[in-house]
Amino acid sequence: MVLIIDGQTSGLAGNMFIGAFIDLGANKDDIINVIKTYANEFGDIDITITKQPKSGIMCTYAQINTTDKSTRHYNEIIEKLDDITQKHYPDNEIILKTINLSKKIFKTLAIAESKVHGKSLDQLHFHEVGCADAVADIIGSSYAYYLLNLDKEKVYSLPVATGSGTVKTQHGILPVPAPAVLNILKNVPTIGGCVNTEICTPTGCAILVNITDEYVSSYPYVTRKTIGYGAGKKDLEVLNALRLVHANSVTKNDTVTILETNIDTLSGEVLGSLYDKLLSEGARDVTITPTIMKKNRPGQIIKVICRNNDAQHITNVLMEETGTLGVRVIPTVHRGVAIRENIHEKININGTWEDVRFKIGYINDKIIKCTPEYDDIKKIANKTSIPIKDLIKYVEMEYRINNRGD
């Protein structure tokens, strides 16, 4: 499956991403709980999720209010996020991925601000980054992205409307798009749009560039669409809602980058930690294969599959974590892929309805693979004392029985 980000009329904002992800099916209560855990450490916030019509279309509006307008240094924010994670979610894989993505988004904002103001990261106080509502926007959007398993799918973005005119800031009246927005979107196709006002925030733009795989001028060839609308605050003469389209791609191939390096100096414990680190940093798959190296020394070949946009970042992680001085890069590898879908299904287990996520693979509308999410199976197994292998077999059978007509 693919995700298409459509900000052709609405522009981009962090709370619009949250609303659109919830509209697509992300669990709003889980998102609110995670947002409050992090954002309340930066200042008191209040979150309200409601349905609102925009241009006659019912949308989900994520309203985030805070009375705290303090600013913080970039390094302070990163350290605080890590401290909160260690305190509340030290072993939660989805949270660890969320925080890694969030830190990338913060870094994008920090670099843009530093270039605009001509200061180093250590010297900057962040007006956009430091506030609790910006922390809420970034954490909430990143967490929802992983809740929907969108990191495993290709993300397209259509040209982004930036708005036009001028905007009043604490530095004076500036043209739209604002300098930080223009800097973040420097490699992104943009249009002015139909309105004479600012409709792109730096936070929304930073989220976009960190999750998009490819920028396209029109919708790709897709079927079986699910649509989510995230409402903006302003009432405009055009649709002020970010549209996210989750769909099956008719294209049967994908492109990825393969990274390889040979290692003979790491212990088994370090290799195990490296495996988890690479996945949490955005790798799609990691394999570690024993081999014999120069002078008959035993070693390992570490192979990583990642999105093209993540290749440089993952390369840096490999070098930092292993000490290797070289990584082989095999770019734009084409792979044949089945149409894939991530769905939620209610399964009756011993008289109780349990929510189980499935990864479904299709060829010509025929199910060729049906795999329940291990974390869900493990949770149910702990609750029911049913062996995991028996649970997997049972829920797969129940899914196929319940979906024979699909």
From Swiss-Prot:
Recorded superkingdom: Archaea
Transmembrane segments annotated in the record for this chain: none
An example Gene Ontology molecular-function term: lyase activity
Family matches, as InterPro entries: Ni_insertion
Alphabetical UniProt keywords: Nickel
Family: Belongs to the LarC family.
Entry protein name: Putative nickel insertion protein
